[in-house]
Amino acid sequence: MRVQPSVKKICRNCKIIRRNRVVRVICTDLRHKQRQG
């Protein structure tokens, strides 16, 4: 899980979702997991 100031889609499987005010990226590639913070 990477914590970044701005999250971006890395590949076409990445999905940007918001869970209680936290922006996250979920993907089939676990190295692409990110959260904004």
Curated annotation (Swiss-Prot):
GO terms for cellular component: cytoplasm; ribonucleoprotein complex; ribosome. GO terms for molecular function: structural constituent of ribosome. Coiled coil: none annotated. One of its GO terms (biological process) is translation. InterPro entries: Ribosomal_bL36, Ribosomal_bL36_sp. Keywords: Ribonucleoprotein, Ribosomal protein. It comes from the Bacteria. HAMAP family: Ribosomal_bL36. Belongs to the bacterial ribosomal protein bL36 family. PANTHER family: 50S RIBOSOMAL PROTEIN L36, CHLOROPLASTIC (PTHR42888), LARGE RIBOSOMAL SUBUNIT PROTEIN BL36C (PTHR42888:SF1). This is Large ribosomal subunit protein bL36A. It comes from Neisseria meningitidis serogroup B (strain ATCC BAA-335 / MC58). The gene is rpmJ1.
